[in-house]
Amino acid sequence: MPKKQTNFPVDNENRPFRCDTCHRGFHRLEHKKRHLRTHTGEKPHHCAFPGCGKSFSRSDELKRHMRTHTGQSQRRLKKASVQKQEFLTVSGIPTIASGVMIHQPIPQVLPANMAINVQAVNGGNIIHAPNAVHPMVIPIMAQPAPIHASAASFQPATSPMPISTYTPVPSQSFTSFQSSIGSIQSNSDVSSIFSNMNVRVNTPRSVPNSPNDGYLHQQHIPQQYQHQTASPSVAKQQKTFAHSLASALSTLQKRTPVSAPSTTIESPSSPSDSSHTSASSSAISLPFSNAPSQLAVAKELESVYLDSNRYTTKTRRERAKFEIPEEQEEDTNNSSSGSNEEEHESLDHESSKSRKKLSGVKLPPVRNLLKQIDVFNGPKRV
């Protein structure tokens, strides 16, 4: 008893709920009831796992016990999955073989008269399924490296024979399989390049009994393909093409650009039109623009203008001023009739005094303008 009292907590005297047997105190009543089961031997929590009849007084003890069952079942599942994988590998459907080749089983439904007998890799025994559902093994290369001849071949049987009378003949079955593929490829119309590749693929090969069956010998194909592409005729054609291209470039560099006849469009002298634009052909912008002949052409085309009415942002804009010649003024005086025409004439005389005369600028007679104005302002004819 004194040994049990040493295990009591420090505030055991202050706890409201005490055990009548060992005088241990508890803060909550359910904790006291759970403690009483240790004295009475009551175990209300039973294990529900099949085949296990253990019982526990506390629920946490039952949970700890259930972990042993779940962990054991997980171990059993792992063991069963490993055994299943080993069975598939032994039965001729390996999932991953030595990290190089991958066999992907694809179930295929075939009629009863076309059922395929798959020979097991280890043991040499024949498996024949009566329900005509057989896995088709498709080889997939996991690495592009060439495979040695001792580890590459696949032999499916071609005729469903009974187990009692069937004897595995690997070389004959594989030869018939190759002959059927060759007949299918010979009937198809393909180009010469692919036909040559098919001929190389369909060459007869040995059929060793190795776990990595179902692969073609591809180690000599890249060398033969490179040998074909590097033929002397192709090399000769490339050489002649390079020679002709070099000669054409050399003649192009020696040529001098022909200076096209340039037309000069002069605009009125104005401080705003100080810049000019060259209207020469695009031949001057070739890489050999530093030639002296092209510099001369550029100097000749310096005075060519594309737009006579260009304005720049830095120049000062002024209103255009025109002056009517004296002959036109006399015509307007003779043709004016009425107060409106006299007013227009006086305005023209006043404005003409303040305008500057510009060379090469002529306006139509004022009488024509006035006639057009009268026609425009007059009654419209329907």
UniProtKB/Swiss-Prot annotation:
Subcellular location(s) of the protein: Nucleus
Miscellaneous remark of the record: Present with 504 molecules/cell in log phase SD medium.
Keyword Manganese: no
C2H2-type zinc finger span: 17-39, 45-69
Protein name: Regulatory protein MIG2
Stored InterPro entries: creA/MIG_C2H2-ZnF, Znf_C2H2_sf, Znf_C2H2_type
Region (Disordered): 252-283, 316-364
Pfam families documented for this protein: zf-C2H2 (PF00096)
Main location: nucleus
Source domain of life: Eukaryota
Entry keyword set: Carbohydrate metabolism, DNA-binding, Metal-binding, Nucleus, Repeat, Repressor, Transcription, Transcription regulation, Zinc, Zinc-finger
Biased composition (Low complexity): 259-283
Role played: Involved in glucose repression of the SUC2 gene.
Organism of derivation: Saccharomyces cerevisiae (strain ATCC 204508 / S288c) (Baker's yeast)
Molecular-function annotations in GO: DNA-binding transcription repressor activity, RNA polymerase II-specific; RNA polymerase II cis-regulatory region sequence-specific DNA binding; zinc ion binding
